[in-house]
Amino acid sequence: MKRIGVLTSGGDSPGMNAAIRAVVRKAIFHGLEVYGISYGYQGLINGDIKKMELGSVGDIIHRGGTMLYTARCEEFKTLEGQQKGIEQLKKFGIEGLVVIGGDGSYRGAQQLTKHGFPTIGVPGTIDNDIPGTDFTIGFDTALNTVIDAIDKIRDTATSHDRTYVIEVMGRHAGDLALWAGLADGAETIVIPEAEHNMEQILATIKRGQERGKKHSIIVVAEGVGSGIEFGDRISKEMNMETRVTVLGHIQRGGSPTGADRVLASRLGAKAVDLLLEGKAGMTVGIQKNELVYHPIDEILDRPHTIDQEMYKLSQELSI
């Protein structure tokens, strides 16, 4: 293998630039040429591909977002779109591809592998919802962003004796809500992986009031439902002032934490190693601080699960 490509796809996450940097530098270290594909699979179809040098990835390790840009591409879900992408890869002489993104990005990588093109997936998503790895690139940064926001909201909640509902990202996974809620001592954490009982939530708030508690913090993953609806119901049922904050896309931005920079560097470099070893259709990850890899097919067939021990702890501490 003499020439590889790298792209980012789907939602951006802090640390993607560090992963791109690692792929480019590791490949050049081993004498390979590297081509960056802009705007994900859409850019691949369109031939938006340029050669990258060491200087191409200078001064990016600390930057959020992705220097290669990203996009969602419905066309690549079709056989025709996939064939167009493969034609572009062949046109540029690219023999292997590193795809950085979430499960949708992995599905594109899976199709390329089925067509006989060596592809390695690197988990980049703030949702932390990719099986086969303890952490995904961007999760730690997003977690710290959410914690910082809740810390500030708690100050004003206490000052005004209010209950706050904070909606965080996580359409199908509650990791961000669970970890942030536990770190911030939320009274209630509502996630897609666990059933929630509104009566129990109201009872928890009421017990706090009876103890003289000046505020309540409720963290809701967006996949469960609207934070605004939660807030409205609490206001009506408890006859109390409730405020709702939807954190939104602020969770995706910002300079990546040290943990995300190191994780991204390790995973990006490992992806290049796997291509050099002749592996294809694999995803890289980290488990118990050890780098691992798994078949993409296996990862996509495996459901995301929450850390039950952490969820149990959050329930025990929010009495």
Curated annotation (Swiss-Prot):
Active site annotation, chain numbering: D127
Subcellular location(s) of the protein: Cytoplasm
Chain segments annotated as coiled-coil in the UniProt record: none
Binding site for substrate: T125, I126, D127, R162, M169, G170, R171, E222, R243, H249, I250, Q251, R252
Gene3D superfamilies linked to this entry: 3.40.50.450, Phosphofructokinase domain (3.40.50.460)
Role this protein plays: Catalyzes the phosphorylation of D-fructose 6-phosphate to fructose 1,6-bisphosphate by ATP, the first committing step of glycolysis.
Protein name, entry field: ATP-dependent 6-phosphofructokinase
Taxonomy of the source species: Bacteria, Bacillati, Bacillota, Bacilli, Bacillales
Originating gene: pfkA
